[in-house]
Structures are given as C-alpha cells and as structure tokens.
Amino acid sequence: MTAVAAPSVRTGILDCVQVNLAVLADRRHGPGRHLALGAKLRFRPRPGPDGLPTVDPPPEDQLREGAALVGLRPDAFARRVPADGLRALAERAPVVYAVADSYDMPWLPYAGRAHMDHSFLAGTHPDGAEVEDAYDNETAWGPARPGRWTYPWERLPTASFACALTPVPAHRAPRPELSLDDPAAYVEAYTAHPDRLAAARRLTAETWLLTRARHLHAAYREHLGERLDAAEHLRRWDRLTATAFIAQRRAERGRPVPGGLLPELASLLTADREVFAVRPHRPRPIRTTTQATEKP
C-alpha cells in the first residue's frame, strides 16, 4: 500500500461516498475545492433498513449533487459494471469513480464482514488495476486508512455504478444552504423501535454521518471566510457519536444503554438551526465624502 496523493483532503470529515469524489475535486481544481461538498447541510430522513429512518442519501444522488458542487461532471456513466467493464472504462479515462459493496473490497477491513455502499477510484497499472481509496475511519475490525493498492482486475467488485468525472469550467463556489426537517419523528422512531439492538447499530451509523456532515459544513463556511461559532456544538456531536458507539457495544452484550443518548440527539438536531443559520450577506458600507459648495 502507498499513501494517497491528496494531502489537502480532510478525509476525517467525509463519508465513504464523498471522500473519493473529494480526492478528484482537489486534484482537478486545487486544494480546498472538496470542502464545497459541505455547502448544503441537510436533515431530511428517508425510510431505511430495519424500518428505521436514515439520513444516508442514495449514493447515485449523492454523487451527482456532490460533483456539481465541486465542479465535476459525471461522464460515461454506467450501472452494474463488472470488473472487466471497469477495466474497459479505465482504459478510456484517466481514472474511474465507482461505488460497490464494501464486503467485496479486499483493501478494506469490511471485506467479508460488512455490506455497505462504498466508493473507490480505479485506474490502469502494468500489474492490473490501481485502486485508490481515501476512506479514513476506525472500524470494528481495525482502521481503514487512505491508500493505493494494485490488484488483478478480477479481484475488483462489480460496481453498482461507475463513471469518469470531467472538470467543469467557470465553476462558481456554491453558497451555504440549510434544509433541516423537524427531528421529532426521526428521534421517536429510534426511541420506540422494538429491536433495541438493531436501533443501536443503526444509530451508531446515523450519528457518524450526522457528525461528519456538520464538521464538513462548518469547514466550508470557514473556508469562505465566515466566522462560525460552532466549536462547542461540534464537540457535542463528537461526544454523541462516541456515546452511540458505546451504546451499541452495550446492547450487543445485553446491557442497558445510556438513557440520555436520544434526548441529546434531539437537542443537537434542534440546535443546528441556530448554530448553522445562514445570515444575510451584508456588504461593507461604502464611505462617501460630501464636498461643500458655495451658494451663488
């Protein structure tokens, strides 16, 4: 394994679909471009696994919106792409962005253990396929760290979709935007779910996604020069994510989970509106001088 050549990318605040899009954004447009992936802070739950709501968007939607935010355009887009199809695409493009099942990715700790949508980059190499993945996370099976690996093409998973990403000229930085639904129904769904272990496992993933999204949004606002008083709020989100993981481990052992987890989630989701409120842009006042004139 070799390190990913994108040191400007803040991998620790990106999810597994965003992070490799971020690598290409900075590679094509320069350091910091990837932070525009955080321009739109959303809380819009949709139906998810185990009858629980999720904030995890469909990967294809996430790619298309994210690419537009950072000034990239998906080209040669294809669904259900086997390894030989990825190879054919890579022979026509500098690099291929793909999303597949993490269970089938030999470079990840999830390989053979956990199913989830996960992105990677693939290119040609004299020894086969060069895989690049900037995912950065601690998992139950060990750390996942950014890197490059070389595999025979047949070792690559079938992608649910794959494409090339082309730079868009004259791209303008997106303005910050919020779209935050009322959190009551979301929190109640986790509170009332009859399978406490399933709820605890899902909530661990949800808080991880929610926390990274808020860190990314704050980083983008600061990148634009805005002074955002969000440090303590973000620390509370970090603590909530850690508490959710502890709650999952306790639930797996048949032990009671911390009682304040869901009330704190509700409190933080409610506070997002004020902490991340987009204030109207106020241009600096223009100083004018008035010249005195004599009356005739």
PLM regions and their residue ranges:
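Intrinsic-disorder-associated interaction segments
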Residues: 10, 176-180, 196, 233, ...
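Hydrophobic transmembrane signal anchors and adjacent membrane-proximal interface regions, especially
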Residues: 55, 163-165, 286-288
